[in-house]
């Protein structure tokens, strides 16, 4: 969860959705509540590591899982949990059949080193994927989905989402979306 900026954005976009968030650092949880406006009545926050949470979770499956697991030393971010085949499989098992998996990587090299490409094209649940990038950062977000989708479908969905369509019209959504390819 970090300081809760993604949780807050999701709460704005989807006001009637209950969000489950995991954060190991109690200071980040406090920041999310006090300074970033996370509505805790609509977000159930678990203070533990993502690995512990996923290993013990037996509740309802999720529509979307966002893996944004970073740590950093000397200002250099790196994944706190390796994006390996077993880790991706554990995340997949927590998704509903049509669920999406979004994974944040520090850069494209880190995405290439992960198990995402192998998992995407091994004939498993995910049939398509995208890499999302902003021109202002090196981060790459991989989106894995069970159905076949093209970038035109993604853009159409954005234009049909009221809050996002206004930002899209004003040129405020500066990003690139490309299909993940082997």
Where are the predicted features?
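Surface-exposed beta-strand edges and their flanking turn/coil or helix-capping segments
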Residues: 45, 60, 96, 116, ...
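Low-complexity, flexible helical/coil segments
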Residues: 55-60, 82, 98-106, 137-141, ...
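SAM/dcSAM-binding transferase cores
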Residues: 132-182
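The AdoMet/dcAdoMet-binding core of the Class I SAM-like
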Residues: 1-94, 110-111
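A short, terminal or domain-edge coil/loop segment
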Residues: 49-57, 75-81, 119-126, 151-168
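A generic structural signal for alpha->beta connector loops
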Residues: 16-18, 40-42, 98, 126, ...
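Short, low-complexity, polar/charged sequence segments that are solvent-exposed and flexible
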Residues: 17-19, 39-42, 86, 121-122, ...
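C-terminal substrate-binding/active-site "lid" region of AdoMet-derived donor-dependent transferases
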Residues: 75-79, 85-151
């Amino acid at each position: 969860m970090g300081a809760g900026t993604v949780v807050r954005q999701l709460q704005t976009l989807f006001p009637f959705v209950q969000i489950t968030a995991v954060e190991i650092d109690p200071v980040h949880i406090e920041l999310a509540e006090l300074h970033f406006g996370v509505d805790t009545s609509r977000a159930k926050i678990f203070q533990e590591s993502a690995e512990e949470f996923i290993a013990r979770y037996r509740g309802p499956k999720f529509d979307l899982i966002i893996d944004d697991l970073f740590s950093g030393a000397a200002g250099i971010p790196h994944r706190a949990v390796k994006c390996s085949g077993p880790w991706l499989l554990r995340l997949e098992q927590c998704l509903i059949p049509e669920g999406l998996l979004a994974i944040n990587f520090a850069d494209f090299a880190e995405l290439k080193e992960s198990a995402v490409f192998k998992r995407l094209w091994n004939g498993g649940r995910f049939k398509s994927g995208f890499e999302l990038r902003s021109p202002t950062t090196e981060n790459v977000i991989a989106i894995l989905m069970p159905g076949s989708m093209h970038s035109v479908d993604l853009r159409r969905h954005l234009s049909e989402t009221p809050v996002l369509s206004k930002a899209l019209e004003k040129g405020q959504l500066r990003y690139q979306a490309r299909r993940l390819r082997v």
